[in-house]
Amino acid sequence: TNNNNFNNINNNNNNNNNNNNNNNNNNNNNNNNNNNSNNNNNNNNNYNSNNNNNNNNNNNNNNNNNNNNNNNNNNNNNNNNNNNNNNNNNNNNNNNNNNTSFNDNCNNNSNYHNHSNHHPLFESLQNINQYPLSPNNNKSSNQHLSHSSSNVNSQYYQTPYYQPSQKQNSPNSTPPLNGCQYENHNLNSNNTFFKKNTNHYISQQLYQQQFNQNVNNNNNNNNISNNNNNSYNINCNNNNNNNNSNYNNNSYNNNNNYNNNNNNNNNNNNNNNNNNNNNNIFNENNNNNNNNNNNNNNNCNNNYNNNDNNENKYCVPKIEIPQKNLQYSPPPFQLDSGSTTPKTPSAPTSPVLSPKTSNKICDLVLNIVPICQELSNEDGYQNKELLNKIQEYFEDAIREIKKIKKTRLPLMKQNHTKESDDKTFYSLRPRRNRKCTIKTKTLQSSNSEEIVCQACGTRASPEWRKGPDGFKSLCNACGLYYAKTKKRENEIIGQPDLIPKHMKIHNLIND
């Protein structure tokens, strides 16, 4: 018994999830158990055995798990040697991810393709034809299939070249059952590759045919991020358990249809979706095709069913008021639902109001609507009470708008220039240790209570002294000089004998 376990892990391994512990047993029963440490994900357990009876039992257990366990994503591919081909699709309904297992080594080949109708991401889906196989062809023995990727060595993969103008199958049609014919749904650069071991129990050509026929149409990369687990079952006890994990937000969501990198609002597990995401087992031998409706939406609207942004919370339906048989009656007041919806300006430079503020103004305006209805029914608009109510509502709305303007308008540029900038004070005395005569410019404080020296214009002084006006308007130095000069003048005036013959008072003061 050969157990071929392939684990493709993108980027880092030092993360929170210990995933994909593949136990390789030496028994004849091939059980590839994926022990996932995720609490919510016990996914993709592939029980492959040689007995047809065990496969039938596993299928019954899988149906019970898919129907009863809404919190577990159980997609078990259990068809190895049966004549019935069960295609278990792990449907990621948020990203339209289809995991389809093709067991073509049985008598009946049933290939099921689950498409998304007219989705813009699937406009480039192409059909890849089956590889030509020959028993003597050495290339085909090493031929491996891969989804289109740029990070894969060319020595392991040989991807067929196909033209974009190749004819596509219709979205709802089942492709012809000719071995490994599948559609390339890979739109991203995530890699899914398969590596082959030589089987000692089957010939080289038979192994190649079975490997190519059992290729899983593995839509790992239908949308922006896919974490899909794909099972590739090969006959004669060859179990290819491919565990693919995409690196999402520094953690591995392995064996998990759990989308963290999608642009949608819902993180959906297979059986845990609010959008009716079902794990469908497709039995093609019974001609029962269960189409999952969540993967057949035109624009993937199932991911936006819970979007509250599409609701017009403050929209008012149209109001039609019957007209009275009067000589003059105004036309009925109609309010369109879209006219009262607060619109956010698209210009980046325009001030954007918060939803709370815009809704408050909208409520103030909408309160006027019933009053306008009553006024339209009145004769001649002579009801003063209704007019007063309207005036009050308008005043409240205007008051609120003015408050918003005060907060939204830019502040006025403050003028820091003062009148005292233009004032100059001429020195009445030469300053100490200063031999030049320069006009001293000093700033006068805007505070009228602050004292300024009237002679030199200083504001700081240890003591304020009396000036010519009789008040303490001079600083300490100017006050002392003024007092000394005045005292000397008084002494000379009181004693005329001390005055020289050719000396006058003004000459003394100037000296």
Curated annotation (Swiss-Prot):
Start-end of Polar residues biased regions: 124-135, 167-185
Record key words, sorted: Metal-binding, Zinc, Zinc-finger
The keyword Zinc-finger is annotated on this UniProt entry: yes
GO MF: sequence-specific DNA binding; zinc ion binding
Zinc finger (GATA-type) residue numbers: 453-478
Protein name (Swiss-Prot/TrEMBL): GATA zinc finger domain-containing protein 15
PANTHER family: GATA TRANSCRIPTION FACTOR 22-RELATED (PTHR47255), GATA ZINC FINGER DOMAIN-CONTAINING PROTEIN 12 (PTHR47255:SF4)
Residue spans of biased composition, Low complexity class: 1-111, 136-166, 214-309, 337-351
PROSITE patterns hit by this protein: GATA_ZN_FINGER_2
Disordered, as annotated region: 1-194, 214-313, 325-355
Species of provenance: Dictyostelium discoideum (Social amoeba)
InterPro entries (alphabetical): GATA_ZnFinger_Domain, Znf_GATA, Znf_NHR/GATA
Keyword field contains Zinc-finger: yes
Example GO BP: regulation of DNA-templated transcription
